[in-house]
């Protein structure tokens, strides 16, 4: 956050990525959202489950190599998406929202089906926004 104050530009901000915060062992809940809210430009949702024997790994700046499994955003056992959506509602988030998950998507039909399922999931978690559009 100190760097944001130094940069001090209205078009420069943060992307809130709870899954990556979780991989790094950082809190991603309400306290974090309150701190980041004034600087957030996008919410980027994906879902991971930490697993020492997981098939995917990434080097992190604070925990070294971390192994995990990719999960669909609606699956439990990874990011607490209920808490994330409740927190976004509490801070009044009405900005951009991106969902990322390439795992298991190999065809255009796979992508359309996944996008539709994601849209339904997001609609079920947001209050007053039944107009979420699948592009």
Predicted regions mapped to residue ranges:
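Histidine-acidic metal/acid-base catalytic patches
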Residues: 2-12, 16-135
